[in-house]
């Protein structure tokens, strides 16, 4: 299994609503047009890792991602789809990670903030200022373990001491896994 399978992490989704954007570990070869989220007006989502609620089918699909490792900027060889919805309280991500060898997914249950690069995980880096200097991040391992913290681009450092009240659930599938992740808006830190 290549590093990419284990590191579906630093890719740009483009500017998101309210000026928030995902920080990138790799530069995009071409500009990505602004992307949008679906406004959720129904009852709060019950996180179960399944993307079977009707609103997920209505949310825009973001699927243009690039490698960070082993070759920064190369188009990702395996498909990952991200959908974003927002309600009054949170950003809610629905992620579908396809894998041609799902039996090789490294889904290790670990303590909080112990999701490391030797495991399969999805990571989201949010850069509320849009300056690409600092970001808040969350990693969700394929077994459902969480790690969160802050990232500094200046020294390429990840600090796992902050906790952002993020909730997530994972569902293993025949061809990969899916993740539902709820990130409270109140936890986004603006400089």
What is each of the regions a protein language model found here?
Residues 2-13:
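Bacterial N-terminal signal peptides that target proteins for export
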Residues 21-25:
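N-terminal signal peptide c-region/cleavage motif recognized by signal peptidases
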Residues 26-191:
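Structural preference for beta-rich elements and adjacent junctions enriched in aromatics
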